[in-house]
Regions:
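Charged, non-catalytic interaction/linker regions at domain boundaries
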Residues: 4-8, 12, 21, 37, ...
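N-terminal ordered "arm"
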Residues: 18-31
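Charge-enriched, short contiguous segments at helix-coil
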Residues: 29-34, 38-42, 295, 337-391
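Active-site-adjacent bridging/hinge elements
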Residues: 269-278, 325, 345-351
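Residue-level detector of well-ordered alpha-helical segments, enriched
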Residues: 277, 294-298, 318, 322, ...
Length: 416
């Protein structure tokens, strides 16, 4: 559908008469100079929001550089007369709207947020992890301000007398600062997930957070019965900070350096995107307190790597293919591959029980085994000369098929 048609659908759905004093209004808001848009029919609210989203998603450049809210506000302002008079927009109206949006220059924003649960061995030097930069605030405040002082007449007092211990920075390309925050926050979420994957252990000894930090806390309970009164207090949360500039976290032999490097690239191939998505699902798995849910997320990480289609249902044949592929990648001998294949099939039978019958009886041992298999597959793919240049799942299966059939041929017995 053309943008013109969507805009006129939006105008038609919006009700703009005077709604003051009415009791049947489900939603109302103002646009332009205090002009109201309201909805009586709740279904029209859903249709209106859907139309706004379709309009916003119709141009990828605009979608990448504006927030949905900003786009909505600008659309209402541009077509204010059409809203108030209930008249259809014309092609030239829509063209000028898009041109005005694209006339706004794309700028580079440095977005900083507090990062918790870390410490730096060398705090006087900014730490680079892929596309992220981490600063100890006390040591680096003047350095950060000097970068922007050189580009502006004076540096505004943006810190508002705050005194964070550490800051993490992401540079975002956007047309307004709200979009820069939205983009940066997506990457800060990814940072947390990547770091969990790299740490590799679902433990509460460490917790690094930008947007989702809970920290050290107490859980108290007060217990009463007819015969006694009692209370309980337990501590939860990280016991010590992570030393974020340890070489282990960027080790090339484990592929961690490559994973961080992927965060700086905008042109990842299809398979590299799968790897990064699998890393994020492993990070989600490690943060999930529910054993069945954490188990499923670890399985999803493997399925992202090995399934041809995102819509594929995990049938027995696909499960066999995944198990065999994992065995070929991780095993170094026939016996080891047979053992791994059997192990993965057993773990996938547990996945099936969770999904189809709601089974909650997942042992820590089974979960940790699946988690380590998922992490090991990614490590092997990123560090193996045969696999680190794979650019699609089809390419991966071509290589694995050659490995599978590279064994000795079955020879004919003598005398036959």
């Amino acid at each position: 559908m053309k943008l013109l048609d969507i805009v006129n659908e939006i105008i038609e759905l919006a009700e703009t008469d005077n709604f003051l004093g009415r009791t049947d209004v489900s939603l109302s808001f103002f646009y332009g100079e205090g002009n109201p848009i309201y909805f009586v029919n709740e279904n029209n609210i859903i249709k209106y929001d859907d139309a706004i989203s379709r309009a916003f998603n119709s141009d990828k450049e605009i979608e990448k550089t504006y927030t949905l809210k900003k786009y909505h506000d600008l659309l209402q302002e541009h077509f204010r007369e059409c809203f108030s008079k209930k008249c259809s927009a014309k092609n030239e109206d829509v063209s000028s709207f898009v041109e005005n949006l694209k006339a706004e220059s794309i700028k580079t924003f440095s977005v900083f947020r507090d990062i918790h649960g870390i410490v730096l061995n060398s705090p006087k030097i900014p730490l680079l992890l892929g596309g992220y930069t981490i600063y100890e605030f006390a040591s680096q405040k003047e350095f950060v301000e000097s970068i922007f002082d050189s580009k502006t007449d004076s540096f505004p007092p943006i810190w508002c007398n705050d005194n964070p211990e550490y800051l993490i920075e992401w540079k975002a390309e956007a047309r307004h600062f709200e979009k820069a925050i939205e983009i940066a926050d997506e990457h800060f979420e990814r940072f947390e997930l990547i770091l969990r994957y790299v740490i590799g252990s679902a433990t509460n000894h460490f917790e690094v957070g930008v947007l989702n930090y809970q920290g050290w806390r107490q859980r108290k309970a007060y217990i009463l019965s007819v015969e006694e009164v009692s209370n309980s207090s337990t501590t939860h949360g990280p016991r010590e900070p992570i030393r974020l500039d340890e070489p282990y976290l960027v080790n090339e032999d484990t592929g961690y350096h490559t994973v961080w490097g992927f965060t700086t690239k905008t042109n990842l191939n299809k398979f590299q995107k799968r790897i990064m998505l699998a890393v994020e699902w492993i990070g989600q798995s490690m943060a999930d307190p529910s054993p069945p849910s954490a188990f499923i997320k670890a399985a999803i990480a493997l399925e992202i790597i090995f399934t041809h289609s995102e819509n594929a249902i995990i049938t027995p044949s696909i499960m066999n293919q995944i198990s065999e592929s994992i065995a070929l990648i991780l095993g170094s001998s026939v016996d080891e591959r047979l053992k791994i294949e059997s192990q993965v099939k057993k773990l996938y039978s547990l996945r099936s029980k969770i999904v189809h019958s709601g089974n909650k009886d997942i042992s820590q041992g089974d979960y940790k085994t699946l988690l380590e298999i998922a992490r090991s597959v990614i490590k092997k793919i990123l560090t193996s000369d045969k696999l680190n240049s794979v650019d699609s799942v089809e390419d991966l299966y071509t290589i694995l098929k050659k490995i599978k059939y590279s064994g000795d041929a079955i020879s004919q017995s003598a005398g036959l």
